[in-house]
Amino acid sequence: MGQKIHPTGFRLGVIKEHRSRWFADPARYPALLREDDLIRAYLTKQLSSAGLADIQIERKADQIDLEIRAARPGVVVGRGGSGLDALRQGLQKELSSHGSPERTIRINVVEVTRADAEAVLLAENIAQQLERRIAFRRIVRQVIQRAQRAGVQGIKIQIAGRLNGAEIARTEWTREGRIPLHTLRADIDYADHIAQTTFGVIGVKVWVFKGEVLPGQERPEQKVPLQQPKRRQQRRRPTFEDRSAVEA
């Protein structure tokens, strides 16, 4: 079960919360859900260079509270808060163009302290490098090393498509550390992304295991222990497994 279901949806109500938190009458629910989709699409497009990790939406009467988690919050805020004002005006215009009534929009920006431990940012980085035609094995090796330095307990990366321009599409994946998908208390961050290459579409999936959390408790911010300098050792190269034969 844990191998097939979405890792985030599997843990909703246990250790993870919904990305949109509000209640509405059945008649208004579709319109508000559409608004959430418009807000996320607009912010994702406008903040593509800010390292956007997550968008949380809350509603209170005629007010919308947005919490934006970004690796580069300065890009979102702008000089003197000009970026936030532009976002509010742009969101108001976008929502009104689709028939939504005017609402008060409040934006709170939170900095992502460990960008290399966020599955969304890792998947986006892999896709960007694939579009620049860099060898996928080199990309995956560098991403795994960065994630391990960020203090994650496990990471799994899966790439599918015409890898390195091959004639036949295939799926390859690699894993370092633990990824306990069946354990509900395991804090697993999952993300997928698409790379538009000259050879076609390549799909990227990333699982990041950040530790275990007891139900009802907040996830503590993990601190990366300071490591003493040591002699350089021979690093084991990640191994890849080809799933194309199994899936066929």
UniProtKB/Swiss-Prot annotation:
Name under which the protein is recorded: Small ribosomal subunit protein uS3
Molecular function via GO: mRNA binding; rRNA binding; structural constituent of ribosome
Lineage: Bacteria, Bacillati, Cyanobacteriota, Cyanophyceae, Synechococcales
Assembly: Part of the 30S ribosomal subunit. Forms a tight complex with proteins S10 and S14.
Superkingdom to which the source organism belongs: Bacteria
Compositionally biased residues, Basic and acidic residues: 238-248
Disulphide bonds in the chain: none
PROSITE patterns the UniProt entry points to: KH_TYPE_2 (PS50823), RIBOSOMAL_S3 (PS00548)
GO biological process, one term: translation
Region annotation Disordered: where it falls in the sequence: 218-248
